[in-house]
Amino acid sequence: MPVAIAAARYAALSAGASSSRSAIMLSSSHRALSTSSKVASSSSSSNRGTFSPTSPILFSASSSSSSSSSPSSSRELSHLSWDKYLQLRRSRRLAGMVTTIPTTLLAGAAAGSYFLTLELDPTNAIAGLDPVYINAGLTLACTGLGWLIGPTVGNSIWGLLHRSDAKQIAQKDHDFYEHIKRNRVDPTRQSVQNPVPDYYGEKIGSIKQYRQWLRDQAAFRRKAAHGLEQDA
């Protein structure tokens, strides 16, 4: 009988120990699962944290590139030198002078072929004048109109050939005319013996000619101030 009681106690103790061991194993497995889930969540949050700053960096890079493009455009506008600009200006003036010849001839020929070939009645006077003189005057007027529009046509053709430098030339035109207005003489002081030297600076085609233009303006001022004395 005592042996049976001892055996029962031993069996109960062994069963309790096994159940406690299984409980400990279950709790440890739960803790392992919770720690692994925490590690996974922390790693995902860290990945999100490292990815999120990339968009501001991209925007800042794009903004810096856009800001750097504006100084480059300003440098392109200021790339045209004064010597090159004055050469282009001289070629533009030459183009206007050259195209004046064909426009004048074409206008005169067209007007003459029309007005001078009309059948006229000499007895029908126009405003008291012979119709022949009226038609001749109209022919001359059309010829003069062709001479006037010649520079406009030449400048338009020249502008089409230099479209790539249009903005730079326009800026240089503005700066050049500001120089001319600031340094040219007062035209009210001119006389027959002392005319104004190139008031608009149209003949300036180089830096050397611009310096000569400045000397001519100074000579005009001296003559106007000292009674038309001969400039030494």
Swiss-Prot record:
Keywords: Membrane, Mitochondrion, Mitochondrion inner membrane, Protein transport, Transit peptide, Translocation, Transmembrane, Transmembrane helix, Transport. GO terms for cellular component: PAM complex, Tim23 associated import motor. It comes from the Eukaryota. The keyword Aminoacyl-tRNA synthetase does not apply. Its main location: mitochondrion. GO terms for biological process: protein import into mitochondrial matrix. It is found in: Mitochondrion inner membrane. The keyword Transport applies. It is a multi-pass membrane protein. Component of the PAM complex, at least composed of mtHsp70 (SSC1), MGE1, TIM44, PAM16, PAM17 and PAM18. Belongs to the PAM17 family. Component of the PAM complex, a complex required for the translocation of transit peptide-containing proteins from the inner membrane into the mitochondrial matrix in an ATP-dependent manner. This is Presequence translocated-associated motor subunit PAM17, mitochondrial. The gene is PAM17.
